[in-house]
């Protein structure tokens, strides 16, 4: 009987210690050849950066984080030897990323000597992501090594290095582009969409999104992406421009709709945008040249 009680006791202890709260993600990190005694992880929540420093003991550390479901979490390499010093600044090393999945254990293993190659386990979304990162990680490693050579010396022939780095970037983007249609029910595909946006015609980008499953499109990020697409469609060539009104320096109200039938150049800028403000003298030159020809300027 005593043996049975002891056996049951350890079963209960194992169950308690293995539990992960349904509103947190447990992150377990295993490292090799990493010289620091902590590793930093960061993520975004509510528009703010959040972070934790995970203490390492014998190459292993763990922490529970309250990151929103499917938030991208990044492991930052704070080892100064991994950074690139360039001029008066630094170029930080690439991060290792994974997704927060509530109630799950996410295990990340990496060797600093092969950074940012990593093994990521735990949760369906990270399983999907690892299928991509398993191929992309070695390319990111190669690109980083080339960048270290590119910025380390003025004596190297930089053009071949730049071309090889550019080719790797294109290969990585192609991997992401091919992953999306093959995995329409994966949150990873939704996360990858912004990265391929600039290289695709808008119609193709929109179709990639619409081909995702309803479950993925109805997530918080999916709804946000849908809203961004709807706003972009309003400003495509050939669409009726959204009306707005502004007060000019003489106190007169100017409405875009009042200028129907005219050629109108609209310049949007912010007081914080130094390059925008530097362009104003050129804008004045354009105004002096084209305003007499019927072009209306709104700045």
Question: Which sequence ranges carry the predicted segments?
Answer:
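N-terminal targeting signals for export/organelle localization
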Residues: 91-93, 167-237
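Bacterial Sec-dependent N-terminal signal peptides
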Residues: 1-30
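N-terminal "domain-start" segment that seeds a small globular fold
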Residues: 224-256
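Active-site acidic short loop of glycosyltransferases
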Residues: 185-186, 260-262, 292
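Conserved redox-active cysteine motifs that mediate thiol-disulfide chemistry
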Residues: 260-285
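A non-transmembrane, solvent-exposed segment enriched in polar/low-complexity residues
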Residues: 19-167, 171
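Structural microenvironment flanking redox-active thiols in thiol-disulfide oxidoreductases
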Residues: 277-299
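Conserved hydrophobic/aromatic "anchor" residues
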Residues: 244, 254, 259, 268-269, ...
């Amino acid at each position: 009987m005593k043996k049975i009680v002891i056996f049951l006791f350890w079963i209960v202890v194992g169950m308690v210690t293995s539990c992960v709260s349904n509103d947190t993600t447990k992150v377990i990190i295993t490292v090799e050849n990493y010289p620091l005694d902590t590793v930093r992880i960061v993520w975004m929540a509510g528009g703010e950066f959040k972070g934790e420093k995970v203490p390492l003991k014998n190459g292993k550390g763990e922490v529970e984080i309250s990151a929103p479901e499917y938030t991208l979490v990044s492991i930052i390499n704070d080892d100064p030897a991994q950074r690139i010093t360039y001029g008066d600044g630094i170029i930080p090393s690439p991060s290792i990323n994974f997704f927060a999945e509530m109630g799950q254990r996410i295990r990340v293993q990496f060797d600093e000597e092969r950074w940012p190659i990593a093994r990521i386990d735990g949760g369906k979304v990270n399983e999907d992501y690892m299928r991509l990162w398993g191929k992309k990680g070695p390319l990111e490693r190669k690109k980083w090594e080339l960048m270290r050579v590119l910025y380390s010396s003025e004596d190297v022939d930089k053009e071949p290095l730049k071309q090889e780095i550019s080719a790797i970037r294109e290969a990585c983007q192609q991997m992401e582009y091919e992953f999306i249609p093959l995995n329409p029910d994966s949150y990873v595909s939704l996360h990858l969409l912004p990265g391929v946006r600039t290289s695709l015609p808008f119609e193709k980008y929109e179709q990639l999104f619409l081909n995702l499953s309803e479950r993925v499109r109805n997530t918080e990020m999916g709804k946000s992406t849908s809203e961004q697409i709807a706003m972009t469609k309003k400003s495509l060539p050939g669409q009726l421009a959204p009306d707005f009104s502004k007060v000019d320096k003489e106190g007169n109200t100017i409405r875009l709709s009042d200028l129907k039938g005219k050629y109108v150049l609209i310049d949007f800028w912010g007081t914080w945008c130094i390059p925008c403000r530097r362009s104003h003298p050129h804008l004045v030159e354009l105004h002096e040249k084209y305003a007499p020809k019927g072009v209306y300027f709104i700045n």
